[in-house]
Amino acid sequence: MNIGCIVQARLGSKRFPKKILKTIKRKTILEIVKSRLEKIKSVNTIVFAIPQNKKNHELEKFLKKKNFLYHKGSEKNVLQRYYFTAKKYQLDIIIRITSDCPLIDPYLCEKMLQCFIKEKCNYLSNILKRTYPV
């Protein structure tokens, strides 16, 4: 089973442009997010889903330089971007991640993933109704 994290990433934030390329202790937010996702034991693919436009060319260059997997798709239709990213990398289960969350908890993600598999869910979330941790 191919389990992957798809990280939704873009540079076009109006409040804090390019925030995902800003650094904390010499690591970009994106690098921190990826390193935390790598701690999710059951995940075997981490891929960035980025908009296909000139505004995100710098992001694409960064991802290439770091040898991070990525897929470009619609800026406006994020669901479509996820769909084609999952299809390209043949993902059976997707964990949806936002790129501006350097405090993502890999242990909570693993716990939710195991719940998803055990209960044979179609969809699992802890934000529709706040139920932290699971």
Task: For every predicted segment, state its role.
Residues 43, 90-91, 118-122:
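Short, high-confidence coil segments that cap the C-terminus of an alpha-helix
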Residues 51-56:
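A conserved acidic beta->alpha catalytic loop
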Residues 64-76, 87:
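Conserved donor nucleotide-binding strand/loop of the catalytic core
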Residues 85-86, 90-102:
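Short beta-strand-to-loop acidic/aromatic patch adjacent to the donor-nucleotide binding site
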